[in-house]
Amino acid sequence: MARRANRRALIGALLLGAATAHAAAGETVACHVSYGGETKIVEARPTASPYTVAPIKFGSYLLFRIVFLNEPADLASIKLYTYAEHEDIDGRPLIHQATYAYPPVPAGRYGFTGLNHAYEPRYGLVLDYWCELRGSISK
């Protein structure tokens, strides 16, 4: 009898784990990025190699990058970066960075981040964004 109960508990745990892994596999971070009067939705899937995630260019001088780690649990996070791009400077100066625990807690109208404004001081540029966690990739 105890053996049968243990077997049922094991099967239940395996099914729950598989369902959780399947749900997480379809998740994306969707950021609503506004720059120059236009809003684009940029989506990112979970990655195992954060250093390979390329930034998305907005205008001539701004770049936005989403790094979504959902495992291992102790490193799970969502990191958002905004960089400036100047021809006379080597590299890309970081002008804004935000880190959120995974899974994030929705903060209301503007997803889990709230509405953010990244300011580039040389040219006076502003990039606005807010992000949400989606259950599957939008088409």
What kind of region is each of these model predictions?
Residues 1-11:
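Bacterial N-terminal signal peptides that target proteins for export
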Residues 13-23:
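Hydrophobic h-region of N-terminal signal peptides that target proteins for export
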Residues 26-139:
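Cysteine-centric segments in proteins
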